[in-house]
């Protein structure tokens, strides 16, 4: 075991690739105002009142991404239970959980009870199976298959 430090830069690059990056205000699939790397505009954001299509600077996009990433990283640890247990996971598994949390939010991630249980038991085969046994898996397409592949690669080591 021992503490494994998550590769933050790699994790952020993977999420950015999966979320995409848009330098303007756009509507997500549910019609919510979004900007940058999947940042859901909040009423307290200055951009909340902006028209869809308004350009947003790279600096602003990066700032929200920093905040959102940190928030979801902390949420992932909270959902998982303890920082120590989270840090004892193989590094790629840590990235998968943070990526899922960024995509789903902590509340929805916490509903993946069987997947989290398998993860806590370091049962990667079962974790991969449980990922697939969800509506999310079909909804996000290539992203879920890629994340599942990372989990399955942990089996083979």
Task: Label each PLM-derived region with a short phrase.
Residues 31, 82, 143:
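Glycine-rich, flexible loop/turn motifs
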């Amino acid at each position: 075991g021992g503490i494994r430090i998550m590769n933050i830069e790699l994790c952020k690059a993977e999420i950015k690739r999966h979320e995409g990056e848009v330098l303007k205000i756009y509507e997500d699939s549910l019609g919510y105002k979004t900007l940058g790397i999947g940042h859901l505009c909040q009423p307290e954001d200055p951009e909340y009142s902006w028209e869809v299509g308004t350009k947003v600077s790279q600096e602003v996009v990066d700032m929200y991404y920093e905040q959102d990433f940190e928030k979801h990283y902390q949420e992932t640890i909270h959902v998982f239970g303890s920082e120590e247990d989270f840090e004892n996971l193989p590094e790629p598994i840590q990235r998968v959980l943070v990526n899922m949390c960024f995509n789903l939010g902590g509340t929805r991630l916490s509903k993946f009870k069987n997947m989290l249980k398998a993860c806590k038991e370091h049962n990667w085969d079962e974790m991969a199976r449980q990922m697939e046994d969800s509506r999310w898996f079909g909804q996000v397409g290539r992203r879920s298959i890629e994340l599942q592949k990372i989990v399955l690669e942990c089996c083979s080591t």
